[in-house]
Amino acid sequence: MGASASTGLSRSQAALRIAPCQRWQIHPALRRPIFRACGRICRPRRKTQIAQTIATLMRRMQAIPGTPGRGLGRADQLEQKKVLAAFGGHAAKNKSNAYMLKGSEAETDAKARGDWEAAMEAFGQSQDEFHETSPRAKNASFTWTAVDGEFAAPSERITNEMLAEITERNADFLGHAQSGLEMLRRFEKRAG
């Protein structure tokens, strides 16, 4: 196995590597979620990170025809390209997470009137807004960022409001993850 000239990784490492955009995947040997970015492997250290990962994986699997999440197939029948395509992408993650948000006032009003087209349009706007605003607090808490030409530390950017919003949203999302987690446990029992 020779090393790739462009990445310095062996062919097997390069085949396992997921593009520099951040993506989770289940490591076959470890049987737990890992994070792959830029060729590095980082295991989630907290149970909440794992639960969030499971919730995200389950939501994305439920959207793919033929996956166990849809009840239309078995795990060994998954089409790998469809699964990887569904798991990929920052925008896809945020837009799928928007399904767990409380509906906007415009969406609720449209549903009450029976105007499903307007409700779908309002939800689409909510998804786009969530995709724009959701990463702001997360990024502020994790990375040094250039603000007005100067770098600001996370401790200078994160506010109590951002922290409260993240905490509340995580609690809601983790509550939604429970059914997906139970489904994964059932699959594991059947496979074992």
From Swiss-Prot:
Keywords: Plasmid. It holds the Pfam family HEPN_AbiV. InterPro entries: AbiV. It comes from the Bacteria. This is Uncharacterized protein y4gJ. The lineage of its organism: Bacteria, Pseudomonadati, Pseudomonadota, Alphaproteobacteria, Hyphomicrobiales.
